[in-house]
């Protein structure tokens, strides 16, 4: 008669340990690398994957991508939000029993939780929030509505900025509040007023760092002294050097978690003298021209406001040449007649032409949306605002400058049904271009911050005891 075999205590203990290990390994919190591969809607064919350069030549800090730069397995229909998991040994553990976690580790663990929440939202096609949501993104205007919504929830819940306090007005801590560069000053003022929920109490709590220096104000001050813009370059670099020498944060990341904002045409030139030093630095720019060094995976395209339509730039000159006051259906004015109301004209129009001027951006994009007019983007090399999450092809029309002579034929070829669909979607996305003070969820200031938030989630800081 066979005897009853009883497992030894050693084997039971070993089995329990193995089961515990498997539970920890497959936990969503351990899978902390969410890589957001951007392929912005641009008037040029761009489909880059995010691979951040390593360090600046002036520091030794190692800034890593949040996951392997290899092409990730995509869980989505469109590329901007895709997930990849790299070697588990490179993951940042969410609990350490051996030693006390550094503040940098705590920050990175916080971002890991955000990535896990976004991953779950994509997988479950739902969102998780601890507060009532005032708006639920949905529909094809978003590259992935679930990813965007959960990402915005995580940003509101977690994202903290440190605004450097060094420097004095008028070049620092303020910017233009009206006219063509107004978004620059409005954003700086929102961050400077001190009541934004995104502001960190201490710099060591911050996920990202804002340099509140205004390129427009620098130009205003120094252009009168020397009507040439290169003297402004060392002013910006000097400011960065001041905060880099006073705090450890720039050198820790080689500038990868730092950003500036500017709507001035000359803003892209501030890094020209030392591209290596600024190669990781996030620039939030209206002049988002990929042919002039704008990198969609690193930089952020900023919507421009408040346009007056004088002829400047080759594209507008070409537009005036072919269509200026030549057709009742294609109304193109260099200077609007006194009896005409600009915003009324936009509101009465089906399609609003948004040509580039001397630089690629056009404020008419925003104005068209306010009037529920379908924007017609006429530009080369322009990375459109918020194209990390918005699919511009679903609510705008794109016409390359070389086809301006065919403008009427192209627009006439759009059926009434297609036009009404585009217009309905314009109304849906218009909320993302509204400027509110104080900022509100999903408005333009939140969208700018969300663009920075995405880029911050795509890097991993070195684990030093800062």
Regions found by a protein language model. Give the residues of each.
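Catalytic binding pocket for nucleotide-activated donors in carbohydrate/polymer assembly enzymes
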Residues: 341-434
